[in-house]
Amino acid sequence: MIEIGYSGDDNYPLGARSAGMATASVMMTDIWASANNQAGLGYLEQAEAALYYENRLNTKSLSQQAGIFAVPVKSTAIAINYRYFGFSKYNESKFGLAVGKKLGEKIALGVQMDYFHTHFAGDYGNYGVLCGEIGLLCEPVKNLTVGAHLFNISRSKQKANPDERVPTVMRFGLGYSIRDQATISVETEKDSRMDAVFKGGLEYNPIGELFLRCGVSTGHLYQYAFGLGYSWKSFTIDVAFSHHQILGYNPHISIIAKLW
């Protein structure tokens, strides 16, 4: 059986910036930190909204959409996020309320409460479950950022099958900035159901507001990704393509708007 990266009550990194770096993003501090590592929200300086779309396997029924709204208040930011995957007969939704706070110039902490809802057509019905997340970011030395994130700290169980727990996912990564022009990211991710996955990504700023990205990840199947981003006035648009050895290319697009 081929896994395509989604399952009920699962957690999945969001944003085309993350996708273009093979999701090596646990150390990033953009608005997508609301889904990837809530500690990164503590570095948000303006109210922002973001939308994301992924067309997996070029099949509408496997597409994923997400939206985030975040507001900073001094050294704290509050965000709400929503993710949807599936189609009318089967779909998954994730609602999240996140808080990220800088505890000092070089450290931040974030938490999130999630509600997962799964819909089955016919006699199978619906079910929901609550989960918790926690994340940490720190800068032990100049230009080096360390990120750690734990999904399902509550060890919640799946209501559709009480003998099964919602997967616990641990992520740890490093990001190193080179002369404010390039960032190298490395990350390891351990899902309680699977072997550890290792990821690496590169983001390069060749000129102005243009960013080029690439990344690779290991796992049961080798994958690689590439993408680009461009900022114009209050908007940032990111596009990425990830490649699965067997299933082919998946396009990703996201847009961020600075509100006030």
Task: Name these PLM-found stretches.
Residues 2-260:
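Subset of outer-membrane beta-barrel
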